[in-house]
């Protein structure tokens, strides 16, 4: 069984093989804009990303573009520090676009190909981010479903189990009946331990 470093090397090789270089460069540009808290340049970079969607890219690459655009709208919300329904709606829309592509083309795929593996990884991150977006709207049940959808792809995806554990911790006290509170507290602990077991996979 490959160790963590071998898994990372395999993923990086798969990602660079499957995802077009122009899209990989754009992903890095978005990351740098967020690190620099450069909100002014994010909207024009989103327009560049949207223009790439009309290109003849493979499905995984288009999933990555939608994922990056969704993250950019999330980053705008975080940098500006204000609740923006407009940004949140666009974030939800692009995450859903990425996941629609995954569910239509790869959901039942049993292939071990590089493209399927990359699509699964983008889908896990998209489900997790979608769960966090719904959590921001206090739509806890839908958010729980999103985190669990990510874990159905791989229960080693620690970002999903970590966020699910945190959400269940917040959701448990909202229950009226004691046994319901206990149920969600136990579920919270279960996913916390799962995160601990897979913490090497945290990003």
Question: What are the language-model segments listed below?
Answer:
Residues 47-50, 89, 96, 103, ...:
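Alpha-solenoid helical repeat scaffolds
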Residues 51-54, 100, 107, 151-152, ...:
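Conserved structural position within tetratricopeptide repeats
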Residues 62, 105, 123, 157, ...:
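Residue-level recognition of tetratricopeptide repeat
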Residues 19-20, 60, 64-67, 114, ...:
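Residue signature of alpha-solenoid helical repeat architecture, marking inter-repeat boundaries
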Residues 31-34, 64-75, 121-136, 159-170:
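Conserved alpha-helical positions within TPR/SEL1-like repeat arrays
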Residues 37-40, 77, 138:
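Residue-level detector of the short coil/turn that links helix A to helix B
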Residues 45, 91, 143, 180-182, ...:
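Single-residue signature of alpha-solenoid repeat helices
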